[in-house]
Design a protein with these regions (language model features):
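Basic, Gly/Ser/Thr-rich N-terminal segments that form RNA-phosphate-binding interfaces in CRISPR RAMP
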Residues: 1-270
Length: 270
């Protein structure tokens, strides 16, 4: 299995609406979904081949976007590496009892807590709270990654005259939370080498694009850079157990979790 990194640089305020948005604030996600990346390249392919509404009849189009390639979400890149969603098993000390002697803001992986500690208070991580957001690995340590956002006030105007005047007597106000410009996010396209070679040939190395909400006005300008084809790193196991971290929701279908995970880690070792 091979991969191609996709580097997305935010050039203007960008809003990728969060599904939990409510009220007068439209919140943004802190990452760029793989479906967005696939949509950008699919749109570019349709335009360059002048396919219009008949794209689904094009064999090459279906092979690239509904075949063996998988488009992986882009997460913020840092000097320490590319971040990823913090696993739910990571717990941070909020108000643990003093007798546990946990330092303030200590982060513990609950998956290993019962192996590392010999008292119930420490094993159960009482007074701990889940770590949210994104982290990056630096050797054996992990560090939180802050995605820079800001909020801007907008007003909707009900008539053309009010739009020209720049004011409104009966419009509504709303707020957009957006990703700040000049941040870099890295995702990838994963699949067989032959399919990736076909993918890379179809597009220029650098692309201008617009993503997210209000992308036809002042939001969403980004640049994308397509990297080289490289092997997907294969982890090795030095012990008798494998720790599987899910970056995205897992759909099992009719298979068991044991069979799905077993198949995924089969190449790592016995």
């Amino acid at each position: 299995m091979e991969q191609v990194n996709i580097t997305v640089t935010i050039q203007s305020p960008t809003l990728i609406a969060n599904s939990s948005t409510a009220g007068v604030l439209t919140a943004t996600r802190g990452s760029i979904d793989g479906r967005i990346l696939r949509g950008l390249f699919a749109t570019q392919f349709i335009k360059s081949h002048n396919l219009g509404k008949t794209a689904h009849t094009n064999k090459d189009f279906m092979g690239l976007f509904y075949g063996d390639l998988r488009f992986v979400s882009a997460y913020k890149d840092t000097v320490k590496g590319t971040s990823f969603p913090a696993p739910l098993s990571l717990q941070k000390n909020k108000n643990a009892a003093k007798e546990t002697k946990f330092a303030s803001n200590t982060v513990v992986d609950s998956f290993y807590a019962k192996q590392e500690y010999d008292v119930p208070e420490k094993q159960n991580l009482l007074g701990f709270k889940g770590v949210k957001g994104f982290i990056v690995l630096d050797g054996k340590e992990c560090s939180p990654v802050s995605v820079e956002t800001a909020i801007k006030l907008h007003m909707s105007r009900s008539s053309e005259q009010e739009r020209v005047q720049g004011r409104s007597s009966d419009g509504t106000i709303f707020n957009y939370e957006y990703l700040e410009p000049n941040q870099v996010f890295i995702g990838s396209v994963v699949g067989p080498k032959e399919a990736l070679e076909s993918f890379v040939r179809e597009f220029p190395k650098n692309l201008e694009c617009h993503i997210g909400r209000s992308r036809r006005t002042e939001y969403g300008h980004c640049t994308m850079t397509i990297g080289d084809i490289t092997p997907v790193p294969t982890p090795t196991s030095e012990g008798n157990s494998v720790y599987v971290r899910l970056h995205t929701p897992l759909l099992l279908g009719t298979a068991s979790i044991h069979d799905v995970v077993g198949c995924a880690v089969a190449s790592i070792g016995s």
